[in-house]
């Protein structure tokens, strides 16, 4: 997008219970507001991504065994990926909040395919234990919605939100 930025950890406890969309939105707001306290003259972006499968919120795996269990759950099924973003600009008293939802249909994958995938990708730092941009074709059948949302941030909507907040990049 051509925007210079710096990453500042929010260092806050994340909400992990309730409706998956509300979890993502509440975490994004909390992250943005925590950082905006120290950077009131800058536009701050807080984001959170949550995966939902059949009513269950799926986060990052605790270990490789947990990653294999998560990938087995996702096998052959469609799940939602929701990313919420909160833009906070305290100096201008602006706040913009939105969420983007995409869906991912997994291929039916067996234990050998799961082991192979885990051996190639650092699954421990990824919600759902996978990354669409890293060997995703081995486990993903189809994607509906924004691929950028699944990979990281929904840049299409983010560009519009930045302009709406008066940020000209």
Stretch-by-stretch model annotation:
Residues 7, 18-169:
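Anionic-ligand binding patches
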